[in-house]
Amino acid sequence: MGVQLKLDPNSKNWLRQPDQQPIQDSICTLPGPGSLLKKKIRKTEFRIDNGLLGNTSPIINVESKIPFHRRANSTPEESRKRVSFSLTSNDGAKSDRSSQKSSNSRKSIRSQSRSRSSSVGSDSQASIQSGTNSEVVSDDEEDGNFASIPELHEDNEYHSNLATSSNPFSDGSSSKSASLTASSAAASPTVSFSPASTSENLTPTSSKSLASNTSLVQSFNSASRSSSISGNQYTYNLLGKSTDESPKITISAGTSMSHFPSASSKLIQMRRHAHMNSEKCDPELLSHNEYFPMMKRGFISRFLCLFVSRDANVYIGPLESSHAKPYRPFGSFVSRFTNRVASDLESQIPDALEAVLTQNNDYDFNSFLHNMGYSRCYVDENYHITIHVSSYERRVEFMLAVCEAMMLYGSPSHKIQQSLRIASRILQLPATFLYLPDCMFVYFKKLEQYSPDVFVVRVTSQTDLNRMVLVNEIFRRVMRDKLSAEDGTEVLRNITSFRPLYRDWLVAFMHGVASASILPVVYGGGWRDMLIGFVLGLLLGIFRVYINPRFFLFDSLFEVIISIILSFLGRAFGSISRYDKPVFCFAALVEGAITLILPGYVVFCGVLELQSKNIVAGGVRMLYAVIFSLFLSFGITIGSALYGWMDKDATDADTCMSIIAVSPYWYILLIPIFTLSLLIVTQSHPRQWPIQMFVACCGYVVYYFSSLHFGASQISSAIGSFAVGCLGNMYSHFIKSSSFAVVLPAIFVLVPSGFAAQGGVSAGLDTASQITSKNTTTNTTTVTTENSQNSSLEFGFTMVEIAIGIAIGFLASSLTVYPFFGYRRKNMML
């Protein structure tokens, strides 16, 4: 760790007239993006008040390299020394006025600086005080005051460097001198710079001639620093010689009260890094073990760390900073049960950050929506980019990053192309786009200074609702001139570097919960079937989460292999009988196990693409969904046939007995459980859970009662999707956010219902029965006319019919909502 202090008078505003007022907007300069976690050197610039040094106003640059992680073996009895910097005058009135103005320093920081920083109490206080005037300046705005809080451990070195390229004290003032003081809670360690009041060596001529000798670095070794805890002072001469005229650096170290980082302060650091970091952050530095030491964790925090790979509030940190609000689901519990005393740092910074990122705290409704996480686009309206200052390369890079992120996290293709067209118009980049599944061709037309370029973006899509919302919000901010294209690209890089929100074992476990909870509701299973359904679903989750990503060859045949295994085990359990009656339902077990890998979402996106006149992408997706369904049907057939060859008395029932059916009143509990498991599998943030569960439950209620009247699956799916689409469109109108992530879980709830109504597993079971029959010789491609309804091809057509009904319902909802609220194409579903 090193802290370097240098005087830099080469500033445009360093000479001012006595009658001029201090330049408020130049008090603190924002440094460029950097990584605090990677221990980069960050710089804070403080402007000295006009009354301190007469007519001159040099800049003091404070550079610090701070170890982000604290030592794990630290004890409460260990003394910690914290250093922050303040400028005071050494005249006779210092002792009287500094005490009066130090109490007002925190208020002055908030009033004079509209940045994401604030004063940090007795642990870290940055102020500029003088005998006549005072300006309070905040610490490093980009680091959130952490760059000016170094720690003096025994294994670190403390450097002090004062370098001058010209004489800043040539005004002839003999009654004032500058003092740079480091304050602490207990015995204050000080770092003071005291130039001589009158000296021939401080003339501009002599200082230029001694420019090569004005840099001096002194270090404390571990022995001297450990013995200086009682308050010993160290004095170093600026020019390397001990004279009365040469400026000196005086450092006195003292003990301070023990202080340990609380969870909130660590979360603030993570949020600040995620917001401003320009490079991909190290995933290992963003784990719970780094921010909540085991010795200080409470039971609740340890328990939550088993389920989430990082704190949920930090994960959504690049867009919002509601630290001190009671609506955060995980962070509040973690902070509350860590057995730490909140410091001034964690109690003051959140308010300043919240005041900056919210548009107007006077509007209770908007503040409530912001705090609940439904809309994270309320920022300071005074900040706009009216002219795009980003270069051509940066704008192109942003468009490609947005395209890649949207494709990666499962955004619908028509939404991707529409967003890219809007971006090309606002960013003044004429471009043409051609989308194919998992591939986007971007052609930038020729401009005056640039030649035409063609880019191909190819990624494998996955469903991540949390990061889908984050990418959409970043895109909206850039399009509304809240962020520049360069800053938007940096935040997108941070988002893509994040690990999944939930741990792998939890995702695999929720596969089992989803299978068990959907069995009685959709497929007619009983309570006994739920246990076996959980085991089969857990097996699917293990293969999908652990085995599939690690073996490339297995990935190519994942659907066939897993359907064979599940069908084999399902028929084995279904063949268990008691008193000549089956104990378990074979059809419910198999259909419930493969629920989460049904291609309903793929077909739904294909139908939306066909409706948006994207014939190529829509046709490819529809064909892929049919082939995918054939894979599942083939696997079910092979698995059932394999067990049929082993057990001649294997069950042939493709439906469940009505006597084992669960009462419909239990659906009130089982549908929310199934929806919650879907939200965790799709990596949805807890802030999104309430509205997503509400929409999904409403959609199923409408589907359930409509199916009692109409019976046909296509009509019931269309009516249920109509209700879901209306709720999603109203959400996008009032909340001003994309509704696709809200209605997507409802689609996953509607697809299994229609799939069961069409008898999805009956095709494979019927073919398997024909294969194992003693009197019939057939194969999987031989289908008679009377059995055409149960053919393998019907399995794929079933998914197409369901998806068409859902898509028609969404289109009808858009047409219905339009007369009442207008058409907001950038937010609505279609």
UniProtKB/Swiss-Prot annotation:
Q: Can you provide one Gene Ontology molecular function annotated for this UniProt record?
A: amino acid transmembrane transporter activity
InterPro entries under this entry? Answer: ThrE-like_N, ThrE/Ser_Exporter, ThrE_2
**Which stretches are transmembrane?**
505-525, 529-549, 551-571, 584-604, 622-642, 659-679, 691-711, 715-735, 740-760, 802-822
This protein's species is Schizosaccharomyces pombe (strain 972 / ATCC 24843) (Fission yeast)
Domain of life from the UniProt record? Eukaryota
Indicate whether Transmembrane appears among the record's keywords. yes
| Ranges of biased composition (kind: Low complexity) | 100-130, 186-199
User: What family does the entry list?
Assistant: Belongs to the ThrE exporter (TC 2.A.79) family.
Cell compartments where the protein resides: Cell membrane; Cell tip
Name by which UniProt lists this protein: Uncharacterized protein C16A10.01
